């Protein structure tokens, strides 16, 4: 139908805009041309903002947030960290069954805030783990519409987290699945007198 064609064109144009924005962001970050506006933010608010932009495959697919400290603060450019969370959550949704559970955990570890996105999908092979953050690497797990996954999302995540002075890594979620964890500097409450 015409309506479906228009919807497909609209979806494809949004995908293309997102692709160009991600590519420009990675390039600017790696060349040091993107200014990062660090402010102290409530981690829970940033997670909530990212979740507004996420659409699961089905109602059975659940996203759970575990954050022991409601007042957890981190220094970040909130707009960029929202993008990191969106990319990690989109990946988890894309590579897990429609009845799966995705867990976001945020906690403080010494002078860093650790935020992780865990899924119970098939996981990532050990030989792919060292390359998942490389630009244009999509791995062996091809999705139905493989042109949609060109390997920019995780590369952008790494560039953003590194620009914040943090690190990002991937580990196995036992018995199956993957956990992406990134760190940000702890934020402090600023009191203006």
List each language-model region with its residue ranges.
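Short helix-loop "hinge" at the ATP-lid/N-box region of the Bergerat-fold HATPase_c
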Residues: 92-93
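Short conserved segment of the HATPase_c
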Residues: 124-136
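Short alpha-helical segment of the dimerization/phosphotransfer core of two-component systems
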Residues: 11-16
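Conserved catalytic submotifs in the C-terminal HATPase_c
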Residues: 37-42, 62-72
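Conserved micro-motifs of the catalytic ATP-binding
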Residues: 31-36, 73-76
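Short alpha-helical Gxxx[C/S/T] motif in the catalytic ATP-binding
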Residues: 153, 157
């Amino acid at each position: 139908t015409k309506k479906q064609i228009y919807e497909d064109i609209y979806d494809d144009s949004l995908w293309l805009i997102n692709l160009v924005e991600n590519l420009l962001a990675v390039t600017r970050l790696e060349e040091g041309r993107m200014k990062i506006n660090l402010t102290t933010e409530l981690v829970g608010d940033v997670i909530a903002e990212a979740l507004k932009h996420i659409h699961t495959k089905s109602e059975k697919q659940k996203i759970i947030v575990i954050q022991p400290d409601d007042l957890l603060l981190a220094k970040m450019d909130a707009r960029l960290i929202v993008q990191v969370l969106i990319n990690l959550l989109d990946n988890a949704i894309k590579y897990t069954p429609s009845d799966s559970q995705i867990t976001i955990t945020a906690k403080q570890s010494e002078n860093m805030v650790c935020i992780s996105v865990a899924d119970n999908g098939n996981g990532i092979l050990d030989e792919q783990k060292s390359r998942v953050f490389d630009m244009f690497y999509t791995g062996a797990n091809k999705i139905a519409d493989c042109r949609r996954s060109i390997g920019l999302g995780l590369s952008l995540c790494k560039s953003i987290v590194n620009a914040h002075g943090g690190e990002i890594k991937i580990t196995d979620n036992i018995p199956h699945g993957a956990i992406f964890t990134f760190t940000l500097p702890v934020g402090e409450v600023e009191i203006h007198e």
